[in-house]
Regions:
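Soluble non-transmembrane domains of integral membrane proteins
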Residues: 82, 86-348
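Non-transmembrane, membrane-proximal soluble domains of secreted or membrane proteins
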Residues: 64-81, 88, 268, 300, ...
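Aromatic/His-enriched, Gly/Pro-containing loop or helix-boundary segments
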Residues: 14-17, 74-75, 157-160
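Juxtamembrane extramembrane loops of integral membrane proteins
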Residues: 26, 35-122
Length: 587
């Protein structure tokens, strides 16, 4: 386990990017070689505009972050009285000063696979190294004289514990005798229902509007890889918006004129917040309520990023009681959970919180298929194997025709060699005779590229699924594979785990594991079953590809290498069967 952790930590993201580029180039060589180096052998075949909304398009930051003494989270949590949160998926607390949701830990996910690893901290209070919290409040209009709760207000709770079976009410009464209530309830996963209430017990009308805000102080460390989005995410007016933290800094700075129209929006329903690779925190307004949305960057000693919305103006007469509802999701972006919320709570396009990429029409089905197989197999490694078999069955007709053509090409090797010897100095005549031979025997020299060409989008879709979906996070296979989303942990430089050596990062690419070696061997064996390319240069390049792919895939997720290896084994079996059948037919 220690060797595994050390090796995985040494493979930094720059190396991952280089590996990703290398495999793309290698696949391109396989598929398009004959196009890049052609030979004459063959010819390549808003609806809420009338509602009364708060006049401000930006939520004033109620709490400006200033340079302060950073304290451990435990010390900060001990300062104020809190309501504890306990569910099968979350632990944490709500700060009764300000009614701030600022303490959440994911119960089922750890930072690493070490036995003593801490659980993932999602939200943290102000005063810690990386504050990240959610506020709920009210703002008054113009010369509104009513006393409103703020971030210094001390709320009273009717219960000390928030659980799936026990909601809580936080209440505060102003000097004007107006009562403000915030009701929190939570399900067994990651969804909070939050209702803000106001009871006007004064003798005058209240003109106020609600706001909800997510704030993140300090720029979080991101993976910064082009196939993954981390930062602001929102769906307003059915338009998915993804902006990184630099975009907010450059275009939505609170201290400068707003540069981009995305910083403010009007809409109804949807969701908005911040996303990491595997986790996110988003506000989910009532789908029937119009809202003003804004996104901002600020800096008062530390960079801060906030997103939130304000609701419509409430004119509350004496004796009247109003409610403002909405939800908060704070947790892991698990596909089945997001799908359930989409269906049961009608949260639009909620599964798009997972970064499916440009080819979502492929990536989503791949993810759903693997999760479906996992439901029966109980192991994601077995699910990947089952998915590979399914793909082979779907592509069987194409692969069968391709392998038949390659088998015919292999059978024609002696005839092709004789033509080369017959016309050593007349290449044009030799090519004409070769074309006639191919036509007579029904062989296609480029047919072998077709199955590979079809596999490319499947390969990259699986890569994306392994990279961005939390289902693969720390998902074990069998034996030495403890995490299918990480590279094979046993490498040749550690004698496959027999030597305790912390391999330097620059040597990680040659610290080839067992699965990549198996993949390379199966690829080499598969090539041996194919006819040798007629062009000597092409033959040399193809001969090197198993070695290139072995090194390239050594740094990729074990689940991806498992897919490739199983796919090679199935291809070998299919090729061997077809060639045996053709040979038997000709005997």
């Amino acid at each position: 386990m220690i060797l595994y952790q050390r090796r995985w930590k040494k493979i930094n993201m720059n190396e991952q990017k280089n590996l990703f580029l290398a495999i793309a180039i290698s696949i391109a060589i396989i598929v398009f070689f004959q196009l890049l180096f052609p030979t004459p052998i063959s010819e390549p075949i808003q609806n809420a505009e009338n509602e009364v909304l708060a006049p401000a398009t930006s939520i004033d930051d109620p709490k400006q972050n200033t340079i302060e003494i950073i304290k451990p989270k435990e010390d900060v949590l001990a300062v104020n009285e809190r309501v504890t949160i306990q569910t099968p998926s979350l632990t944490g607390s709500i700060n009764l000063q300000g009614a701030i949701l600022d303490d959440l830990t994911l119960s089922n996910y750890k930072v690493s696979m070490e036995d003593d690893s801490d659980n993932i901290d999602l939200l943290s209070p102000d005063g810690t190294s990386n504050p990240y919290y959610i506020e709920f409040g009210w703002k008054g209009l113009g010369d509104q004289q009513a006393q409103l709760p703020n971030l210094d207000t001390i709320w009273k709770a009717d219960s000390s514990n928030l659980t799936p079976g026990n909601s809580i009410n936080l209440s505060w009464t102003s000097d004007d005798n107006n009562t403000f209530i915030i009701n929190f309830s939570i399900d067994e996963n990651y969804m909070f229902s939050v209702t803000q209430e106001v009871i006007n017990n004064s003798s005058f009308k209240l003109e106020i509007y609600p706001y909800r805000l997510i704030k993140r102080i300090n720029t979080p460390k991101t993976i910064n890889f082009f196939i993954l989005h981390e930062g602001l995410i929102s769906l307003v007016n059915d338009e998915l918006l993804e902006k990184n933290y630099d975009d907010l800094l450059d275009d939505c700075s609170a201290s400068m004129p707003i540069k981009d129209t995305f910083c403010d929006a009007k809409g109804q329903g949807g969701w908005l917040g911040f996303t990491d690779k595997y986790w996110m925190s988003v506000l989910i307004p009532d789908p029937n309520e119009p809202i003003n949305v804004n996104y901002r960057h600020g800096n008062n000693g530390r960079d801060s990023y906030r997103t939130g919305y304000v609701g419509q103006i409430f004119n509350i007469s004496p004796g009247e009681r109003i409610r403002y509802q909405g939800k908060v999701f704070a947790g892991a972006k698990k596909l089945d959970i997001l799908s359930d919320y989409l269906d049961q709570l009608s949260i639009p396009r909620f599964t798009d919180a997972i970064d499916w990429g440009w080819f979502s029409f492929l990536t989503k089905p791949v993810s759903y298929a693997i999760n479906w197989f996992y439901g029966y197999a109980g192991n994601f490694g077995l699910a990947i194997i089952a998915f590979t078999i399914l793909m082979r069955l779907i592509l069987f007709p194409l692969a069968h025709a391709s392998f038949k053509s390659m088998a015919k090409m292999k059978k024609l090797q002696p005839d092709m060699q004789r033509l080369k010897e017959t016309y050593p100095n007349d290449r044009q005549k030799m090519q004409q005779e070769l074309m006639a031979l191919y036509k007579k025997e029904g062989a296609n020299p480029v047919a072998g590229c077709l199955p590979i060409l079809v596999q490319i989008p499947i390969f990259f879709s699986l890569y994306k699924v392994l990279f961005v979906t939390i289902e693969m996070y720390h998902a074990p296979f069998y034996g030495w594979i403890h995490d299918l989303s990480a590279p094979d942990p046993l490498g040749i430089l550690t004698a496959f785990g027999l030597i305790s050596w912390d391999v330097p990062g620059f040597l990680s690419i040659i610290n080839i594991g067992i699965l990549p070696i198996l993949m390379g061997l199966t690829m080499w064996l598969q090539q041996k079953l194919n006819p040798a390319p007629a062009d000597p240069t092409q033959a040399k390049i193809f001969a090197l590809l198993p070695f290139v792919f072995t090194f390239v895939l050594a740094g990729f997720a074990a689940g991806l290498v498992l897919y490739w290896s199983v796919n090679n084994i199935l291809s070998i079996a299919q090729q061997w069967f077809i060639q045996r059948k053709i040979l038997a037919k000709n005997e």
